[in-house]
């Protein structure tokens, strides 16, 4: 006689109505801590740690952030962008020999392949936001190079693709901008460093050393900054095993959102609207009365001053000019107005406020503010892509269903 196997009924999860408490949990009765038991995170994943990283950290309560243990602000003051790029990829700062070898490695990677260059005019003509043509061009570039899924590559091959994406980004951004203006692209100069090359390719004239240095400090200060939206997007895509180009394209898409990458030009627009110090109260109180955000103030991580803003304020002072003086007046008065209205929050300038001033003083057009940010942040994206691929587990969270109860009978007609 055949013995029947006893089947234990599946325990159904208990789903309570969506609570007002964002940290409320979804539990499975009788299976405490069982694999797959959901943990409900707050909206936006604020404060949620999803992985370990050795790339850097943001300590908001201290007003401090670093790249691989070195203060990012100190790096911006003392090291060129290429050294910081090397640091994020290799894990240590280069010595003189490593610096020369790295420069020799990345210099030829700045040139746009002929098959990609041939299509850039059409991409530029297609229009869209400043990052839209770049997103398309990066996708084309990755296909042109034959980038394969990260899961199929060894570490050296992944590094090769990541280097290529970082090196080509400033060239593509400036070429697309110039083509959109009806101008010919300017090839990178092998004798110029990254920041100088960026301004050279943007304008077609040799940049003033002071401008190149100011832009370099900005670029170094924005290479990486924790698990922001675009970096997290890049890691999610990398976790699927997709190619590095696909991960960067996704990150660009995230950066194109105004809540992430669109504030530098908007902060500068505020300065233009104010015009003179005597109009600060009138303009700002109007925006506050309308319930609008004052662009360039406040940060989701920093509870006081953004260290990047502090550094860029000094860079702006070094550049000088009436606009810088106005910015300092606006910074001081807006902080007072915000303190009066929101005494429980210490809203101070974030990186975007003085970033716009610095870039404008260095001749970077406003439509290129966010692309300029992308030209350095791509290094952080790629460092995170490499780190994700080195110890990968696909990022696959869950969602809580809050629609009508299921299953429902399918109606017939």
Q: Whereabouts are the PLM-identified features?
A:
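Hydrophobic alpha-helical bundle cores within soluble ligand-binding/oligomerization subdomains
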Residues: 2-6, 10-413
